[in-house]
Design a protein with these regions (language model features):
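Intrinsic-disorder/low-complexity, polar/charged segments enriched in Ser/Thr/Lys/Arg/Asp/Glu/Gln
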Residues: 2-6, 43, 58-60, 73, ...
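Glycine-rich portal/gate segments that line the openings of hydrophobic small-molecule binding cavities
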Residues: 37-79, 135
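A conserved amphipathic terminal alpha-helix motif
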Residues: 116-157
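Alpha-helical membrane-targeting segments
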Residues: 52-56, 114-124, 128, 157-158, ...
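Hydrophobic ligand-binding cavity/cleft-lining segments
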Residues: 1-43, 47, 51, 153-171
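Hydrophobic pocket/interface hotspot
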Residues: 16-20, 26, 65, 107, ...
Length: 171
């Protein structure tokens, strides 16, 4: 399965980069993640509980980061095992493109699944992967970015109150 897309995040590239390397941010953003530990240098270990079609499983896995070119690009490779449900493994190439105060995050993912998951068929797996990616990037954008100002809305609030919680940490 292959998945490519890009997302505009309302934060500068350095903030987005820091978020991608922070296990607390990742835990908060990965749908169903119950545990996340490790570091960018040593890799991350995670536990994720998900339901894919009729199959519900707890996946335990590891993710390693390589080819890190701060704050422009990195490669993630990982594998997770979900017991009788099967396994998932794959990688992602991530590229950050600064656009003023915003960053466009481009990603190309290639993944393989096996076991009961593979028996569900590519339509269900591909739909699930797209849904997971959409949810992750929505959560990630909320965590590291400032909200986009609505046109016609009075901007009387203090802007520091509008920033995401991670941005408050690094500001």
């Amino acid at each position: 399965m292959k998945l490519s897309d890009s997302r505009t995040i309302n934060a500068d590239a350095a903030t987005v980069w820091a978020g991608l390397l922070n296990p607390d941010v990742l835990k908060a953003c990965v749908p169903g993640c119950t545990e996340m530990s490790g570091s960018a240098q040593d890799g991350f270990e995670a536990t994720v509980v998900q339901k894919v079609g009729p199959v519900k499983a707890t996946f335990k896995g590891a993710v390693a980061l390589s080819d890190m070119n701060e704050p422009e690009s990195l490669t993630m490779t990982g594998e997770g095992k979900g017991g009788a449900a099967g396994f998932a493994k794959g990688g992602a190439d991530v590229r950050l493109e600064p656009q003023g105060d915003q960053t466009i995050l481009h990603y190309d993912v290639e993944a393989k699944v096996g076991g009961k998951l593979a028996q569900l068929g590519s339509r269900i797996i591909d739909g699930f992967a797209k849904k997971m990616a959409d949810q992750f990037f929505e959560n990630f954008s909320d965590a590291v970015g400032a909200p986009v100002a609505q046109e016609g809305t009075p901007d009387s609030e203090d802007t520091s109150q509008k920033k995401g919680w991670f941005k408050k940490l690094v500001s």
